[in-house]
């Protein structure tokens, strides 16, 4: 019996050449709507779906393949005598190939002016039904949903006269991944439209961006996936201009650096190591900002990741060229800057739109046996809600330093302490199990620069010991959430040493 293929695609990439190859193998082709028209315009002989179903396409194409003559031909088990007898009795012919991809729901809802009605109209019904039927019966049916697989199928047909069983299984698995992702997009869209924040089930879909050499360590396998609607201001959508492929650790560090530099509207540069900032500087231009970020910690910046929120110019590139760096990420690089930096063949140069999100996206964290979901911490300092419980208020310069330190501390692993002075960080204490331990690290790193600096803490002081350490180091201003039952003890210490202290009422733990 002559083999038959059903072809109905929204993505027309390569379909004419593929169908031509099928016809050359003696395979009869059935098609629908726009696909049929395209194939016929290219001189290919195909059969209309209505000739198979004996029923016209109706309801603006909503119903065309939902018919027993189609699904019987797809689902029939060819070595089952009962199935074969029923097919013969009802005049159903088998379908051996299904070439289908689905209505462009993702592309539709990505449009800024999309209406709810447009989105609903682009939910495919017949397509998923066909490919699921074919994939279930993959022992007898080859189902192709991705143009990438056209050449594989044709090559096996030309070589063996049939598609290998292993290939059919792989294609079937791809179908169910495809429909699962498609349905996840639809369910998430409708859930968001209804304003449901914590649905009873959560289905997420990501698209592979690249395989990675390894994970956090060489013995760990890893892959990088991107969210279908991730912000363009993200590492997932960055353009790599130069250098080696990004590693797992590179991606984590670049993401951390990008998150911090987005906090600033003035020219800013952030240096990151192991997802913690080691130096942050702001200035009147990007060269000045980089100089301050470098001077913040000239030791730790070696082998680090740099993020800037302005174009990298030649003079800044020349300074960057002087040290070993893994990545530089910026909105753009001048032609002269690229010439300087591309002389380092392994240095990764990325461009990305630097834009702070105004809405909190969801942050997913895997734990053993489950998944934690929360809003991203995008909250900025609200000066209308702060309080100053100390006798002295911060000076103008102290306010500048406090604000810089507060922007940075929310991105440091808790317990977190950041010291800032003269438009740059001068000490970062990260990830200690007690707050005073982080303070001591930051103060030690700052050395003599701690005198007259500002301190930010991501959470309140449970005891006044951190204030005591700050006072001994000559720190003159502190910003912290407040809210401890021992706040009064800290306020007394601050007043004793003439320290200005600001309560924000907002905690910024980061784990």
Swiss-Prot record:
Domain of life from the UniProt record: Bacteria
One term under GO cellular component: cytosol
Residue stretches making up the MGS-like domain: 1-145
Pathway as given in its UniProt record: Purine metabolism; IMP biosynthesis via de novo pathway; 5-formamido-1-(5-phospho-D-ribosyl)imidazole-4-carboxamide from 5-amino-1-(5-phospho-D-ribosyl)imidazole-4-carboxamide (10-formyl THF route): step 1/1; Purine metabolism; IMP biosynthesis via de novo pathway; IMP from 5-formamido-1-(5-phospho-D-ribosyl)imidazole-4-carboxamide: step 1/1
Annotated keywords: Hydrolase, Multifunctional enzyme, Purine biosynthesis, Transferase
Database matches in Pfam families: AICARFT_IMPCHas, MGS
Catalytic reactions of this protein: (6R)-10-formyltetrahydrofolate + 5-amino-1-(5-phospho-beta-D-ribosyl)imidazole-4-carboxamide = 5-formamido-1-(5-phospho-D-ribosyl)imidazole-4-carboxamide + (6S)-5,6,7,8-tetrahydrofolate; IMP + H2O = 5-formamido-1-(5-phospho-D-ribosyl)imidazole-4-carboxamide
InterPro entries in the cross-refs: AICAR_Tfase_dup_dom_sf, Cytidine_deaminase-like, MGS-like_dom, MGS-like_dom_sf, PurH-like
CDD domains: IMPCH
Gene3D superfamilies: 3.40.140.20, Methylglyoxal synthase-like domain
Signal peptide start and end residues: none
GO MF term list: IMP cyclohydrolase activity; phosphoribosylaminoimidazolecarboxamide formyltransferase activity
EC annotation from Swiss-Prot or TrEMBL: 2.1.2.3, 3.5.4.10
Family matches, as SUPFAM superfamilies: Cytidine deaminase-like, Methylglyoxal synthase-like
GO annotation, biological process: 'de novo' IMP biosynthetic process
Domain-level remarks: The IMP cyclohydrolase activity resides in the N-terminal region.
Family: Belongs to the PurH family.
Protein name as it appears in the record: Bifunctional purine biosynthesis protein PurH
Organism per entry: Bacillus cereus (strain AH187)
Annotated gene: purH
């Amino acid at each position: 019996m002559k083999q038959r293929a059903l072809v109905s695609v929204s993505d027309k990439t390569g379909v004419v050449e593929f169908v031509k190859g099928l016809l050359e193998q003696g395979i009869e082709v059935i098609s629908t709507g726009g696909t049929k028209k395209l194939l016929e315009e290219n001189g290919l002989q195909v059969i209309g779906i209505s000739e198979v179903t004996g029923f016209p396409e109706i309801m603006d194409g909503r119903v065309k393949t939902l018919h027993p003559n189609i699904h019987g031909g797809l689902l029939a088990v060819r070595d089952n005598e009962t199935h074969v007898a029923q097919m013969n009795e009802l005049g159903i012919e088998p379908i051996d190939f299904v070439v289908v991809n689905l209505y462009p729901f993702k592309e539709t809802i990505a449009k800024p002016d999309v209406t709810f009605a447009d989105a609903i109209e682009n939910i495919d019904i017949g397509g998923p039904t066909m490919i699921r039927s074919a994939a279930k019966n993959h022992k007898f049916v080859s189902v192709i949903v991705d143009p990438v697989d056209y050449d594989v199928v044709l090559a096996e047909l030309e070589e063996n006269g049939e598609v290998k069983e292993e290939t059919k299984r792989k294609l079937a698995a791809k179908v169910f991944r495809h429909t699962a992702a498609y349905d996840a997009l639809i369910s998430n869209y409708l859930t968001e439209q209804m304003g449901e924040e914590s649905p009873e089930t959560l289905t997420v879909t990501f698209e592979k961006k690249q395989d990675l050499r390894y994970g956090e360590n060489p013995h760990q396998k890893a892959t990088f996936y991107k969210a279908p609607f991730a912000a363009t201001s993200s590492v997932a959508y960055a353009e790599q201009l130069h250098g080696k492929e990004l590693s797992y650790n590179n991606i984590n560090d670049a993401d951390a650096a990008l998150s911090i530099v987005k906090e600033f509207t003035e020219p800013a540069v952030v240096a990151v190591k192991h997802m913690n900032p080691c130096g942050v500087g702001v200035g009147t231009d990007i060269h000045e900002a980089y100089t301050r970020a470098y001077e913040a910690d000239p030791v730790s910046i070696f082998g680090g990741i740099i993020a800037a929120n302005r174009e990298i110019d030649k003079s800044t590139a020349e300074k960057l060229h002087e040290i070993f760096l893994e990545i530089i990420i910026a909105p753009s690089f001048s032609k002269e800057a690229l010439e300087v930096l591309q002389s380092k063949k392994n240095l990764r140069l990325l461009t990305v739109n630097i834009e702070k999100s105004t809405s909190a996206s969801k942050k997913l964290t895997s734990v053993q046996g489950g998944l934690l979901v929360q809003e991203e911490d995008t909250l900025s300092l609200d000066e209308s809600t702060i309080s100053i419980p100390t006798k002295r208020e911060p000076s103008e310069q102290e306010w500048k330093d406090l604000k810089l330190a507060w922007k940075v501390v929310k991105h440091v692993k808790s317990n977190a302490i950041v010291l800032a002075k003269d438009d740059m960080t001068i000490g970062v204490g990260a990830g200690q199990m007690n707050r005073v331990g982080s303070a001591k690290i930051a103060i030690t790193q700052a050395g003599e620069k701690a005198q007259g600096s500002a301190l930010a803490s991501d959470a309140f002081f449970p005891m006044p010991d951190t204030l005591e350490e700050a006072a001994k180091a000559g720190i003159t201003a502190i910003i912290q959430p407040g809210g401890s039952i021992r706040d009064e003890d800290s306020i007394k210490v601050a007043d004793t040493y003439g320290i200005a202290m600001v309560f924000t009422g907002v905690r910024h733990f980061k784990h």
